[in-house]
Amino acid sequence: HALMPQKPAIFLDRDNTLIRDDGYIFKIEKFAWITGAVAALKRFHQAGLPVFIVTNQGGIGRGIFTESDMHNFNHYLIDAAEKTGGAITDIAFCPHHPLSPDPAMAAACSCRKPEPGLLFDLAQKWQIDLGASVMIGDRDSDVEAGKRAGMAAYLFDRGDLDQLAKQVMDRHFMAKTDGRK
């Protein structure tokens, strides 16, 4: 079978990039968008770019919440994005944390950012061209993961996500897709 052509995508951190985080967030009643997140997701969706979330969820490894809690929260997030005109194609997470009481959860892994394992996994699953893709997150570890995966990476200052999304679109995607300029 022929290989699917690879396409660019947007990779986003979850906590304090898309949604507000006041610690380990897993309860739906605490769900709140970051300023500009809804508009940014809509902007990416209208441009035909798949959006992926890559998130460290060390609260699982530390026993603060369960994988099931996180999946329920993520399903709510995906539904909320769709209801507001955006879309999230897939979410990849790392449950590990160096301070976990469980040695298996505390061991070094390839998925906890700044390691790029989650990015590579999603790229393989969805035929994504990482070299043409962008990573956005609020921590240096997000930017480092993106760079290690060969992507352009942006540090989000927790201001208005759509302002950064517009810059990313103008810099990386509009010039390539709009021949009228």
Where are these regions (language model features)?
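Short, flexible coil/turn micro-motifs enriched in small/turn-prone residues
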Residues: 11, 54-58, 132
